[in-house]
């Protein structure tokens, strides 16, 4: 399939799959779990278009716009803080953050140590390679000399499952920009990461000559907003607000801003 059509179709499917996640809404703004509190949102702003830093060092992106819309709908206050990926969950569990929103996939393992909101985005893992490089199965991935992943991301988990956790062919990096730069410089044969992030990179950097493919070994994943284990009040606050944002149509507007189809038509 033509790459531009594939990107548009993939993003449209994400929107369709998640539009049914919300339930029946409520007319009044949901009360905050702790009225007057400013909820500290930890995020790794190296994951465009979900979060990145603007010219002034502020966190921006899909996750930020969505959380701001949720805060308005749910009548609570938030502040985002950029920090390294590997510090997000420790910050949550030791009380330095109240919420983690950073393209976090809901997994059974993570649910053992934290709670999640309802899903708000659907993705899969994809393989980013230079155009012309053949990748059609996991066997092709296994034949490569170096496969780049971000440490602790689900791309890391997926590749480790295929190749073995200690396989020297797996090159682990701190963030997505670093692994993509290494691929561009020829230090890697491929990168495995989240579909929406890789699609955004390919769309915005056509001169780099990159392409991406999906493999049947990679399953569908859902992003959720993480809170401390047992914090039911904050989970309810977030779910109620997310439901309102979906029902008002604001979710679709934010989605279209970052994941519009070719020609500017919003993905539905």
Swiss-Prot record:
One Gene Ontology biological process: amino acid transport
Lipidation (S-diacylglycerol cysteine): 21
InterPro entries per UniProt: Iontro_rcpt_C, SBP_3_CS, Solute-binding_3/MltF_N
Pfam families: SBP_bac_3 (PF00497)
Highest taxon above the source species: Bacteria
Keyword Lipoprotein appears in the UniProt entry: yes
Protein keywords: Amino-acid transport, Cell membrane, Lipoprotein, Membrane, Palmitate, Signal, Transport
GO cellular component: plasma membrane
Membrane topology classification: Lipid-anchor
Lipid-attached positions, N-palmitoyl cysteine: 21
GO MF annotation: an example: ligand-gated monoatomic ion channel activity
Signal sequence annotation: 1-20
Subcellular location: Cell membrane
Function statement: Involved in histidine transport.
Similarity comment: Belongs to the bacterial solute-binding protein 3 family.
Protein name listed in UniProt: Probable histidine-binding protein
Record gene name: hisJ
